[in-house]
């Protein structure tokens, strides 16, 4: 069982967030033109698929996008304090390769500034708009903390898009693993019509979220976030689930960036 965070720590966290002097600066992405690479028949290394040319890319030139990554808040990628099943092996070199990724020309972060809702209507720390402010800084005052257990945040992109990449940052001030991470795309704001739901990431190998068993790996949070290949999935809404973390039962989100083009 994961430990319950004492009430005193929760109250202390609220006070700290209220008086924090840290500021969340803007974060963007640099675009560069890139010719479409030749197709490769070799299988990607673990964790590397998101950096490859996205599947289902329409014909035409691609561009390179290099988001502005926040500074690391710890050195290296130390293992979590408790054993984690299905945990990917840390690969700093692969993380560097994924800093720049290819997407179709015209792709932008369509999530920036969009409305965010949540399964927890009263976050313990922070506000939901932090999830789409474009800033991935892990400092105090730059994240929203939701209640223990299974929770989600949802972004309304306001219209349907072809989604190529999703870049997700949970709390990365410490070396932690967030559990049962599932990311889904849909045109149904309630996510009830299964025929309209596309799951683009799922490391819930035990199906604790009751959303289906996943095949992705657990990973340690870093300043690079987690880059996910959405393969052109169509949808208006993005929902990100988590179920506590390796340090405590809370769910903390910093930023979600959705790189997409108008739906075709």
Outline where the language-model segments fall:
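Trp- and acidic/polar-enriched beta-sheet ligand-binding modules for extracellular glycan
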Residues: 54-80, 119-121, 144-151, 160, ...
